[in-house]
Amino acid sequence: MANLQERGHLLTEQVNPLSQNLDQLSSLELVELFNSEDRKTIEAVAAAKVQIATAIEQTADRLRQGGRLFYVGAGTSGRLGVLDAAECPPTFCTPPELVQGIIAGGAGALVRSSEDLEDRAEDGDAAIAQRHITQLDVVVGITAGGTTPFVQGAINSARQRGALTIFIACVPAEQVSFTADIDIRLLTGPEILAGSTRLKAGTVTKLTLNILSTGVMVKLGKVYGNRMVDVAVTNQKLRDRALRILEDLTGLSREAAGFLLERSGKWVKLALVMHWTGLDKDAGDRLLSAHQGNLREAVASYKNQGN
């Protein structure tokens, strides 16, 4: 591999010929250029769809067995991982330890630039060791340019512990090769502002993490149709969403849906089981548990037994 001090050959560091007069564009021309270039993020995800789908399947399989999902990154990549992890508990009612974000420099790096902390592979190794990663876990390394030592150290450490490793980069393998179980390359080309990977590289990373985490939760039975039936009812907005889900799927009035939601302990999935089967809260909970929380399978099983 080329000397990592020489990065000009990397796709993410190259100069975009379409934006060489960026400082001379009108505001409208600038917006049009960004809009045009951002279309490449959708194309990049499409080109990596097989690898992303494989990541969903294999990650869901590990989590079913009691594993955890970790995102590891530095700078923008790290912040995006932390963001995606933080959205899982309210959206899918997952425990905070199930999906975690690890960023070089820790929590302080979320709001203050700490890019100098990404250059120590041993820190990535230590981050994995501190979380007692095992063969049941999944570690996703996110690095736009593919060379971040913190991320590479974390992935290498996770591989040694038998974890499933996923590498996400925005440069082709011919420029930066790296060994991981699943290699996802999101090629969006040079940035409008040369080297600023918070732009297209950041956008395509966010798109991919959206798909990965949502896909995994779908496979884990956290979704019914396209409804977030495991939503955590923790504020008025989410209570309204929970009530609308119940109203739409059961035909109940809002008042009746509210009563059902309270009887279920504010768990939409359990409320639906109770409504569709006639079971009480405890029996409905046992039925869901017997089917690993999969609402569709639980209800179908109950009805197939002649109930």
Swiss-Prot record:
It catalyses: N-acetyl-D-muramate 6-phosphate + H2O = N-acetyl-D-glucosamine 6-phosphate + (R)-lactate. Pathway: Amino-sugar metabolism; N-acetylmuramate degradation. Keywords: Carbohydrate metabolism, Lyase. Transmembrane segments: none annotated. One of its GO terms (biological process) is N-acetylmuramic acid catabolic process. It comes from the Bacteria. One of its GO terms (molecular function) is ether hydrolase activity. The active site is at E87, E118. The keyword Acetylation does not apply. Pfam families: GKRP-like_C (PF20741), GKRP_SIS_N (PF22645). Homodimer. Specifically catalyzes the cleavage of the D-lactyl ether substituent of MurNAc 6-phosphate, producing GlcNAc 6-phosphate and D-lactate. Belongs to the GCKR-like family. MurNAc-6-P etherase subfamily. This is N-acetylmuramic acid 6-phosphate etherase. The lineage of its organism: Bacteria, Bacillati, Cyanobacteriota, Cyanophyceae, Nostocales. The gene is murQ.
